[in-house]
Amino acid sequence: MNSSTRYLSLLSALVVLVKGNPVPSALAELMTSGWTSGEELGTDGETGAPPKWEKMIKMLVHEVTTLRNQQFVEEFQKPVEEISSFSQHQVPSTPPHLSKTLCSASNKEACLQEISRGLQVYQLLLQHVKAEYPQSTLLPSVTHQTTVLIGLVKDQMKVAEVVEDLSASERKRVLGEVSTGTEWERKTSVHAILRELRNFLVDTKRALRRMGKRGKDFQ
């Protein structure tokens, strides 16, 4: 994929508007607010703008956080201040934190592969979120931007073909782990997926920034 195609893919993600979707406010926050960690954004050497992936991740973190909070309040009838009380709920198929993978080493290619594979799993798990929380107006944007981010990450690989799509058996296993159980268990699995996706995105942002500092060509 060439730079023009990548730019158009990113642009399409930023302008996608779902009816009733508060994307405009997310765009406003993207342009005006700082990153949650307080770190300054990296810049593109030619334009002085943040790298494409960083803008995309920032948007996604904002929207996934909003979606997680909305689902928690609406589905569990609890204030968002009590969200930490659900931290013990886990989903077996969610990817491990990047700090526990090859991203903790200095192998850039292996780390990019881990990120791409993890995002593919979350892309699939978002189907479960859609099935259990169909009224969400944010979810279509989150799903679309996750797909675009996978493309941006693969663009940085030397051999993107190494990361294959999930097989039919893998897809069946992942969805089977979250689609069964009681209504309560399915709701808590949605919450856990959104929580862990947010954490994975933050880990991804940190890993990509480390790579960017090691090589100016990583934009």
Curated annotation (Swiss-Prot):
| UniProt keyword annotations, A-Z | Acute phase, Cytokine, Disulfide bond, Growth factor, Secreted, Signal
* Cellular location(s): Secreted
Q: Does the keyword GTP-binding apply?
A: no
Q: Which GO terms describe its biological process?
A: acute-phase response; cell differentiation; cell surface receptor signaling pathway via JAK-STAT; cellular response to interleukin-1; cellular response to lipopolysaccharide; glucose homeostasis; hepatocyte proliferation; immune response involved in response to exogenous dsRNA
Q: What does induction of this protein depend on?
A: by LPS.
Description of how the protein assembles with itself and partners: Component of a hexamer of two molecules each of IL6, IL6R and IL6ST; first binds to IL6R to associate with the signaling subunit IL6ST.
Q: This protein is called what?
A: Interleukin-6
